[in-house]
């Protein structure tokens, strides 16, 4: 519960407080940050036109699109942000974007985003995997698995 924030505005402050006070010891933030200090290319998406540009780019080049649905007030979102950047650096064959759920609320609802952060993995515009919450080790595993699938493509 402390690794994700509810998206409803009435619960936002309560969730932020709960998330901020949680202590999750099964993340590798410090390890990832120290091993990979460079910033990866994460494309911010706050307009539907930018989304369409990135999904078209991924589809045209046969790349996996990794989408981080995030909110500026979400403490767990801030926790995974450096890990997400690091993954973008490590996996240049994938496209990493962060969608601002406040700027694109209706769009986020279409993707069934009920809490932040939610990370969705897309191939050819279709969801292949999803992670809800700031479980950094799980995010790393799912990203590595998606990259492995990309490398095995026919």
Swiss-Prot record:
The keyword Cytoplasm applies. Residues 24-148 form the Thioredoxin domain. This is Putative thioredoxin H10. The active site is at 74 (nucleophile), 77 (nucleophile). Disulfide bonds join 74-77. The keyword Signal does not apply. Pfam families: Thioredoxin.
């Amino acid at each position: 519960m402390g690794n994700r924030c509810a998206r409803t505005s009435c619960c936002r402050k309560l969730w932020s407080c709960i998330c901020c006070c949680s202590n999750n010891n099964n993340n590798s933030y410090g390890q990832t940050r120290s091993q990979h200090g460079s910033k990866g290319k994460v494309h911010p998406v706050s307009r539907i036109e930018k989304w369409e540009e990135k999904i078209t780019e991924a589809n045209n080049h046969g790349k996996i699109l990794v989408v981080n649905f995030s909110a500026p007030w979400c403490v767990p979102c801030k926790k995974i942000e450096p890990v997400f950047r690091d993954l973008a650096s490590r996996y240049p064959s994938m496209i990493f974007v962060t969608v601002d759920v406040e700027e694109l609320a209706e769009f986020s609802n279409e993707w069934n985003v009920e809490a932040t952060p939610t990370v969705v993995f897309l191939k050819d515009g279709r969801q292949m995997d999803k992670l809800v919450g700031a479980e950094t080790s799980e995010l790393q595993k799912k990203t590595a698995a998606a990259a492995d699938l990309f490398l095995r493509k026919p």
